[in-house]
Amino acid sequence: MKIKVGILGASGYAGNELVRILLNHPKVEISYLGSSSSVGQNYQDLYPDTPLNLCFENKNLDELELDLLFLATPHEFSAKLLNENLLKKMKIIDLSADFRLKNPKDYELWYKFTHPNQELLQNAIYGLCELYKEEIKKASLVANPGCYTTCSILSLYPLFKEKIIDFNSVIIDAKSGVSGAGRSAKVENLFCEVNENIKAYGLASHRHTPEIEEHLSYVAKEKITLQFTPHLVPMQRGILISAYANLKENLQEQDIRDIYTKYYQNNKFIRLLPPQSLPQTRWVKSSNFADINFSIDQRTKRVIVLGAIDNLIKGAAGQAVQNMNLMFDFDEDEGLKFFANL
């Protein structure tokens, strides 16, 4: 028997990827597409290549008969929308940032709004499957992680867990394709602005910084502060991070490989690449995989970790479906058994 799901925000890039994945999921039926601006429009008019013959509606959510609702909406939307009564009717996976951070003051500092739903904020489960699998299985509200956050935490988690690095020495240099900026029209995202151009943005102010710090602090069991700098590169999709950290002791590469293997050998979507094989975005394009590798610079006594994901799949829609699978006791990779599309 299939579960009935709805999507708010299916017109965006992450929302469209969510539709594409769910259409091929054997245990899901897409029953509702919510929109306030596109009511009556058929989804195929918006995305002719997507075989979903369903029109956008604008119903009161309390009227819906759904097992699960995905929210692929702008920040601050779901914080105002969700309530305990709705969560008694259906499960929620929120792809926005509205329930990712536990400290309400972080929303005032980083997102410039006062969180109106602090009780739900404390009850939401952070949907990074590789760290919080058991909690996700029992959750009614899951906060889907950010794209940079997913790649950064997965790349560094074993090092923090084993406490083999100086936590406050960590620097993360991240690069993302333009789809990470969303589908809305912005001058800085026009073809002539991004083509043949690489630029940094969000210097010392990117909103994924507190998210990365919060969950790596939880792993480390102490508050950590790190440096995170994102860059926009002229490609559609993909994230590559290069992370640097000082080693606490004299370790060899096999020592660190053993640590990563210990934590990731049974994970379906994390691929620790062979030595000398460095992650590339094209190897994970349109897939739910995270590719990771590392090297030690014996001269500087630093470990350099590389991670690559597709920002729209493992960094958004694919991870949301992975969370759904856990919440409904499906196989974790159900509907996600596809590889890179070169």
Swiss-Prot record:
- Cite the InterPro entries for this sequence: AGPR_AS (IPR023013), AGPR_type-1 (IPR000706), NAD(P)-bd_dom_sf (IPR036291), NAGSA_dehydrogenase (IPR050085), Semialdehyde_DH_NAD-bd (IPR000534)
Free-text function comment from the UniProt entry: Catalyzes the NADPH-dependent reduction of N-acetyl-5-glutamyl phosphate to yield N-acetyl-L-glutamate 5-semialdehyde.
Q: Show the GO cellular component annotation of the record.
A: cytoplasm
Q: Name one GO biological process term.
A: L-arginine biosynthetic process
Q: What is its EC number?
A: 1.2.1.38
Pfam families given in the database record: Semialdhyde_dh (PF01118), Semialdhyde_dhC_1 (PF22698)
Q: Which domain of life is it from?
A: Bacteria
Q: What is its main location?
A: cytoplasm
Instruction: Please give the pathway this protein is involved in.
Output: Amino-acid biosynthesis; L-arginine biosynthesis; N(2)-acetyl-L-ornithine from L-glutamate: step 3/4
Official protein name in the record: N-acetyl-gamma-glutamyl-phosphate reductase
Spell out the CDD domains in the cross-references.
AGPR_1_C, AGPR_1_N
Classification from the root reads:
Bacteria, Pseudomonadati, Campylobacterota, Epsilonproteobacteria, Campylobacterales
PANTHER family from the xrefs? N-ACETYL-GAMMA-GLUTAMYL-PHOSPHATE REDUCTASE, CHLOROPLASTIC-RELATED (PTHR32338:SF10), N-ACETYL-GAMMA-GLUTAMYL-PHOSPHATE REDUCTASE, CHLOROPLASTIC-RELATED-RELATED (PTHR32338)
Subcellular location per UniProt equals:
Cytoplasm
